[in-house]
């Protein structure tokens, strides 16, 4: 019973780390990356679709993204969707391909992004601590129900704490890498 609680806690903590990593990946750095356009929705054939479904996004160089639209008639809609997004990008059309030069980040903008990234990291840490709290309370319920001994409870608390420390360390490493990436000019 305790083993399933520990496995569940470990799994939930790794999901928290992954979710935090994904949230941080959405924060734009000075470098071109296809995931920058993941959140863009395009109006096509009367409904909204993710950009991935109507075009292929690639990286031309460190400061330029290319968007190859599958259907030439959709180029205008894709261009409009990119321009109306809050990313501040201005695509240039070349047939069925859009080139999107990424403007370099100002020092002030970089610091704003670092604040956002630190906030995401803190949210990840909080989620991990909540998982720890839940796991420990589950184990204590087992102890009250006389399903395990006090030694088992202490052992499992130590194990949960080790997983918590490890997960928070992973988030801190991801944060440090992202901050370094943001501060590169």
UniProtKB/Swiss-Prot annotation:
Location(s) in or outside the cell: Cytoplasm
MF terms (GO), sorted A to Z: ribosomal large subunit binding
One BP term from GO: cytoplasmic translational termination
Organism listed in the record: Shewanella frigidimarina (strain NCIMB 400)
Organism superkingdom: Bacteria
Name of the gene this protein is made from: frr
Alphabetical keyword list: Cytoplasm, Protein biosynthesis
InterPro entries tied to this protein: Ribosome_recyc_fac (IPR002661), Ribosome_recyc_fac_dom (IPR023584), RRF_sf (IPR036191)
Role summary: Responsible for the release of ribosomes from messenger RNA at the termination of protein biosynthesis. May increase the efficiency of translation by recycling ribosomes from one round of translation to another.
Name of the featured protein: Ribosome-recycling factor
HAMAP family: RRF
